Amino acid sequence: MGENLPLLLSAALGKKVNRPPVWMMRQAGRYMKIYRDLRERYPSFRERSENPELSYEISMQPFLAFKPDGVILFSDILTPLPGMGINFEIIESKGPIIEDPIRNIRQVEKLKELIPNESLSFVGEVLSSLKKDVKNEATVLGFVGAPWTLAAYVVEGKSSKNYSLIKSMAFKEPDLLHKLLDHFAKSIGEYLKYQIKSGAQVVQIFDSWAGQLSPQDYDIFAGPYQKKVVDIVKEEFPDTPIILYISGSAGVLERMAKTGVDIISLDWTVDIEEACKRIPTGIGIQGNVDPGILFGNKDSIKERIDNTFNKVKERKYILNLGHGILPGTPEENAKTFFEHGKKLTY
């Protein structure tokens, strides 16, 4: 690997760095005018995320504008589904719609094995272009959705407020759900390895909806499958740092730490000082800043960044938001977040 590593990768590996790296979840997207202009020309989300030229261009937009320390692939957690035989569409302002929601064993048994270099070659293309072009100026990030969250989408058929369909399956037909989760874990593990081979230097697992589970159900339906994904990746790439993000994770932080990930990405509903006490010291911490602060003034943004960093500076830390940046966020304020983040020092 050599010692001349980009900052975010160095920090994620636990090496000594002069400042915490900074990037943002959803840093490429709707808050940027350049993205909205491109979206008018290419209204289909799937085209924007599956056409390698467009995905590359969008991934680079925030890098060219703000020079964050991480450049994350522009894609979606549902992108691998068609390669398993599950079709979906993303409708602007409505979110994802699964064409044929999975509700029975026949459908699970019909799922195809994911072969990423066949069904997701466009992702490999984008990651290798990013790696080539950002050089050591930033770290290239890949990402996937975790098995529970993918299952929540494909069983519900769309975003849900109370997850009654997948919870019904969990408590009435747990064997069926475990088969589906197991299929996803193997596929997602392979997909992450493909991303790493293609150029991703750090990867993040999003289990966006695992915060909807009680801790005891997390131990049955989410944690073991997160761990399975991590184990598959670490077997071949033991040195690639893995970040785990769950929205609403305050009740399961200790459990997240047992999955084998290197870094836990916090939402903003947990005090970061308390999180530091609950997460073992060998595990890094990312995020925790409320994305809503970016609707405030510049001073409040700087103050919140300083306040968060001062509580966590004894730890391996990556500055980020506690959720994706929100549509409508002023671009000037995103710029302040990055600029001020780069002024922090250990």
Swiss-Prot record:
InterPro entries: UROD/MetE-like_sf, Uroporphyrinogen_deCO2ase_HemE, Uroporphyrinogen_deCOase. Belongs to the uroporphyrinogen decarboxylase family. One of its GO terms (biological process) is protoporphyrinogen IX biosynthetic process. The record marks D76 as: Transition state stabilizer. NCBIfam families: hemE (TIGR01464). Its main location: cytoplasm. GO terms for molecular function: uroporphyrinogen decarboxylase activity. Substrate binds at R26, Q27, A28, G29, R30, F45, D76, Y153, S208, H323. Catalyzes the decarboxylation of four acetate groups of uroporphyrinogen-III to yield coproporphyrinogen-III. Gene3D superfamilies: 3.20.20.210. It is found in: Cytoplasm. CDD domains: URO-D. The keyword Cytoplasm applies. Pathway: Porphyrin-containing compound metabolism; protoporphyrin-IX biosynthesis; coproporphyrinogen-III from 5-aminolevulinate: step 4/4. Homodimer. It catalyses: uroporphyrinogen III + 4 H(+) = coproporphyrinogen III + 4 CO2. GO terms for cellular component: cytoplasm. It is an enzyme of class 4 (lyase). Keywords: Cytoplasm, Decarboxylase, Lyase, Porphyrin biosynthesis. PANTHER family: METHYLTETRAHYDROFOLATE:HOMOCYSTEINE METHYLTRANSFERASE RELATED, UROPORPHYRINOGEN DECARBOXYLASE. Its EC number is 4.1.1.37. This is Uroporphyrinogen decarboxylase.
